[in-house]
Regions:
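Jelly-roll (double-stranded beta-helix
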Residues: 2-301
Length: 301
């Protein structure tokens, strides 16, 4: 915790999780029903694990509160994850680049593009597949698993597609707004939020695409924490007291409350932009805000 001697208060905690400290998985193509790679130096999948998962076992980095999995996946064209099962997780997939085609045992089949969110309550059990069916475009998505408030829920699927959502919603800014937070996911029990995705846990997903030299604030309640991912570009995170962490593409950051004070503001400043799908120059951040759990987060940094 940072102590500000001029104010006599404890500032919020920022823990940088650099991309170099993420486990990068490049599994054998046969694991998910893909043929051998045509180019040996390029694997069909490159997956960055923010928490312990699959062949990456690290008891010092197992979760962040109710966030159990966050994988940053890049899938080559004409490749994907064959049919496999899940149970007792809220699974949220945010598409960054390309198109994701989903099929499941509930009869759902859908293709979603950049800025879309796919979500599943795996509950009692569901089988699904995820593929990049494009011939020459890579697919990047962020998939997060959240522990539900109880096991054995009835499985269900849903999605948010910004190309169509605005046609039927009063909250049209959520589809196209830049330089402001887009609140995409909230708790089914939260009656105060108007989000396109609702899950069975006290967790919120916010995303923002920011132009050059833009600044954006987020107000944290003193009993909340967040995990931030820099999806594209570069940003500075600055606390009320001026403490700063710089994030570049693939970097993460744990944000935790300080002690002895109420709400605090975290400022996000664009310091580097990338040309993204669609042609815009952007810094792009994703943030899961959840209930604070003492002792959460990486213990090996």
């Amino acid at each position: 915790v940072f102590f500000n001697h001029s104010t006599g208060i404890c500032d919020m905690q920022l823990k940088h999780v650099p991309a170099s400290r993420l486990f990068v998985s490049e599994p054998d193509p046969s694991w998910f029903g893909n043929p051998p790679n045509e180019i040996p130096s390029q694997n069909w999948l490159e997956s960055r694990f923010h928490f312990s998962f699959a062949e990456y076992s690290n008891r010092l980095n197992s979760n962040f509160g109710v966030l159990r999995v966050m994988n940053d996946d890049f899938v080559q064209p004409n490749r994907g994850f064959g049919t496999h099962g899940h149970a007792n997780m809220e699974i949220i997939t945010y598409i960054v680049q390309g198109k994701l085609t989903h099929k499941d045992s509930m009869g759902t089949e859908e293709t979603l593009g950049r800025g879309s969110v796919q979500f599943m309550t795996a509950g009692r059990g569901v089988q699904h597949s995820e593929f990049n069916l494009e011939k020459d475009t890579g697919l990047r998505f962020i998939q997060t698993w959240i522990v539900p408030r109880r096991d054995g829920l009835f499985p269900q699927y849903g999605s948010f597609d910004p190309d169509h959502y605005g046609e039927k919603s009063r909250n049209r800014n959520i589809c196209t707004a830049r330089n402001q937070w887009r609140h995409l996911v909230s708790d089914t029990q939260d009656t105060s939020s108007d989000t396109p995705v609702r899950i069975e846990q006290d967790a919120n997903l916010f995303v923002a695409e920011m132009d050059a030299d833009q600044s954006l604030d987020f107000l944290f309640k003193n009993d909340r924490m967040a995990y931030v991912l820099c999806v594209e570009g570069s940003v500075n995170l600055i606390t009320d007291s001026g403490n700063k962490v710089t994030l570049h593409r693939h970097d993460g950051c744990e944000v935790k409350p300080g002690g002895g004070r109420g709400d605090m503001t975290l400022t996000f400043n664009t310091i580097g932009s990338e040309q993204v799908e669609g042609g815009d120059l952007s810094a792009h951040v994703l943030m899961f805000e959840v209930d604070h759990v003492e002792g959460s987060g990486r213990q090996d940094l």
